[in-house]
Regions:
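Compositionally biased terminal segments of proteins
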Residues: 2-216
Length: 216
């Protein structure tokens, strides 16, 4: 019979003198905790979407959840879970969105220059709804602005960003996790070489790189 694993402390980073800077609490292995973590993200998305919809605030689910939603339409076994809940909305609607989300229990904060809504006053930054502003660049050096919320589709309980717009966002950001999300879309056939002709040249080149060298 398997023996329970006793929680323990593990030293984390150390300074140059070898002194521990932090400790990490390690609990037992648990599939239930994994399932619970995924469900928390799902419920956070649904609560936020319901609050925005009830307040008539235009929005669209973006980010990793949008990728997962599109992937699931083709192959649910290829879905990659994400801890982020990203919502695309217009900056002029932030005030209305703030009132709506706070009424649903979220707490507005500025974190690293971003607008986030923590899932309660004691929530961690990971346990939050992250706002992505439509028609604006996330970072000044990026080649394209985000799409408008009108580029979205009704998914029943929420609106999700359209595939074309999602791909443009991911190619514009092009961080490691964005490339991973693009590979997921490529692997199941939602994105292929036919996309190159309809994309702005600067991000079409990025897609070409991924198509020619997926592991690069």
């Amino acid at each position: 019979m398997p023996q329970p694993v006793t929680p323990c402390l593990r030293q984390g980073r150390v300074n140059r003198e070898g002194e521990a800077l932090m400790t990490i609490a390690i609990g037992p292995f648990s599939l239930e905790r994994i399932v619970k973590a995924v469900e928390k993200v799902r419920q956070r998305l649904l609560r936020a979407a319901a609050a925005l919809r009830a307040a008539n605030v235009p929005y669209a689910v973006a980010g990793g959840n949008a990728v997962a939603l599109w992937v699931s339409r083709v192959d649910e076994s290829a879905v990659r879970n994400t801890q982020d809940v990203d919502m695309l909305l217009r900056r002029q609607d932030l005030g209305a969105a703030k009132a709506a989300l706070e009424s649903a229990g979220f707490v507005h904060r500025h974190v690293a220059g971003l607008d986030v809504f923590l899932d309660g006053p004691a929530a961690k930054p990971r346990e939050a709804v992250h706002i992505v502003f439509a028609n604006e660049k996330v970072r000044p050096h990026e080649p394209l602005a985000n799409p408008d919320v009108s580029e979205s589709e009704d998914a029943g309980l929420f609106r999700v960003i359209a595939l074309d717009a999602l791909v443009r966002i991911k190619l514009t950001a092009f961080r490691d996790k964005d490339r991973t999300h693009l590979r997921d879309l490529i692997d199941i056939g939602l994105v292929d070489a036919t996309w190159l002709a309809k994309l702005p040249p600067i991000i079409a080149d990025r897609l070409r790189q991924l198509l020619e060298n997926p592991e690069g």
